[in-house]
């Protein structure tokens, strides 16, 4: 089997268009152009890292074994070692077996240091014991009792004879000396053993631990081969050209931030589209999806005209997202149907959360009643700001597009304890990225931004 080609980072950067899209993950180069439409997280995430190294984001997002299997089919080659980023190891971390007979042949700096420490401490027990015996000999020479038993008898007499205080003091010093010598000998011997054990443990290589997001309390089944047929049981119009579709099935488990693929055969072609459920996460027989129907949208119109009680093919769920445990505040920016994954997080997140939600009109706001209910339940913890592009004349809220000034005025400042979640149309997401780049350039800390 031929070894994979060696590719420079500069060559990878030349493949950064939607139809010619290469990315780097863990030192390998992948061509993901044809995989954009099938990517569970949407093609926007892949285009974000076109021609770049996406190792950190790939590892932070968490992926199933199926994702690694799929990557093998997209492999182009490996990144040249000299072009690897500083934080990217040339080889994956692995545990190395070390034979006992080989230890110590080529000592490292740490081993040499530990060896000197143990030899230094190893001489102390003998010195202390010798000192204790010398002190005991000196004491017995000054007070020549026949034996320890005789000394004890002498000590008892000294309790009632005022002239025997010297004997009592000598006995006390003798006992103290013996106890100190014995305790020191045992303690330092044990310390020497522990230092040797510690040195042996340090001979093994340290394996770098990458941050992994916390899994959902009820993780969903993930994988492209997870296929089910659910029944369309309800369909309601909740905004102009937007419908809430309810599917019913058996044993479907949805985790936080996961989405489903809905598939249908239309005009002899298999069409698929990803949707994030807005129903509660966990094991539920019913799944609610938000579907926006466009005039030329094939799958949306298919679901709009599909008779109730019809079977709908789905795959997944895919993906997984959990906020960082170090975050205390989450700032969300959503547009249109991008509220679906944001709403999932808002409902599950126990900390503070602030939402900037952009729509054209008041009637276009999705899940408006559900969002209002969250605010009523936790008015101090949850805040929602609506931004309308074409509001009525009596609208007193925010107008136009979501701007950098809105982000800076209404959302928390970037910090290690704050996360930013973004989901919406591609144009809005690109604009928000530009705003954060400007904010990062002028701020002390960079924003922790995650795009669904």
Curated annotation (Swiss-Prot):
Keyword Metal-binding found: yes
Pathway(s) annotated for this protein in UniProt: Polyketide biosynthesis
Inducers of expression: Expression is controlled by the asperlin biosynthesis cluster-specific transcription factor alnR.
GO MF annotations in UniProt: metal ion binding; oxidoreductase activity
Residues holding NADP(+): 389-390, 395-399
Recorded GO CC terms: membrane
Subcellular location: Membrane
Transmembrane intervals: 120-140, 166-186
Annotated residues for binding of FMN: 33-38, 80-83, 116-125
Main subcellular location: membrane
Effect of a null allele: Fully eliminates the production of asperlin.
Top-level taxonomic group: Eukaryota
Residue numbers binding FAD: 302-305
Database matches in CDD domains: cyt_b5_reduct_like
EC id: 1.6.2.-
Name the UniProt record assigns to this protein: NADH-cytochrome b5 reductase-like protein alnC
GN (gene name): alnC
């Amino acid at each position: 089997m031929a070894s994979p080609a060696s590719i420079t980072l500069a060559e990878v950067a030349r493949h950064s268009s939607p139809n010619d899209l290469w990315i780097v993950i863990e030192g390998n180069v992948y061509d993901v152009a044809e995989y954009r439409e099938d990517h569970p997280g949407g093609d926007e995430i892949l285009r974000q890292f076109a021609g770049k190294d996406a190792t950190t984001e790939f590892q932070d997002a968490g992926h199933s074994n199926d994702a690694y299997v799929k990557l093998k089919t997209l492999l182009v080659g490996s990144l040249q070692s000299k072009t690897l980023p500083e934080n990217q190891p040339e080889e994956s971390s692995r545990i190395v077996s070390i034979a006992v007979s080989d230890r110590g042949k080529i000592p490292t700096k740490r081993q040499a240091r530990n060896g000197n420490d143990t030899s230094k401490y190893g001489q102390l027990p003998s010195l202390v014991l010798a000192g204790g015996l010398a002190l005991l000999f000196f004491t017995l020479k000054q007070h020549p009792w026949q034996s320890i038993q005789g000394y004890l008898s002498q000590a008892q007499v000294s309790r009632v004879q005022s002239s025997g205080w010297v004997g009592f003091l000598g006995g006390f010093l003798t006992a103290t000396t013996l106890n100190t010598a014995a305790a020191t000998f045992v303690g330092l011997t044990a310390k020497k053993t522990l230092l040797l054990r510690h040195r042996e443990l340090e001979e093994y290589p340290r394996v770098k631990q990458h941050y992994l997001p916390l899994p959902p309390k009820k993780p969903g089944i993930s994988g492209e081969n997870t296929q089910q047929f659910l029944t369309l049981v309800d369909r309601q119009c909740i905004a102009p050209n937007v419908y809430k579709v309810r599917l019913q099935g058996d044993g479907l488990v949805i985790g936080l931030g996961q989405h489903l693929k809905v598939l249908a055969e239309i005009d002899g072609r298999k069409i698929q589209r990803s949707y994030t459920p807005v129903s509660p996460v966990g094991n539920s027989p019913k799944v609610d999806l938000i579907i926006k129907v466009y005039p030329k949208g094939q799958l949306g119109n298919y679901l709009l005209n599909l008779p109730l009680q019809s079977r709908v093919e789905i795959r997944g769920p895919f993906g997984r997202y959990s906020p960082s445990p170090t975050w205390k505040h989450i700032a969300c920016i959503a547009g249109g149907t991008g509220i679906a994954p944001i709403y999932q997080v808002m409902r599950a997140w126990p900390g503070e959360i602030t939402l900037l939600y952009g729509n054209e009109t008041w009637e276009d706001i999705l899940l408006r009643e559900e969002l209002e209910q969250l605010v009523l339940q936790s008015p101090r913890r949850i805040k929602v700001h609506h931004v309308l592009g074409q509001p009525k004349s009596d609208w007193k809220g925010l107008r136009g597009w979501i701007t950098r000034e809105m982000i800076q005025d209404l959302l928390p400042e970037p910090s290690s304890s704050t996360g930013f979640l973004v989901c919406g149309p591609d144009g809005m997401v690109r604009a928000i990225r530009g705003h954060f780049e400007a904010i990062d350039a002028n701020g002390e800390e960079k924003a922790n931004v995650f795009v669904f």
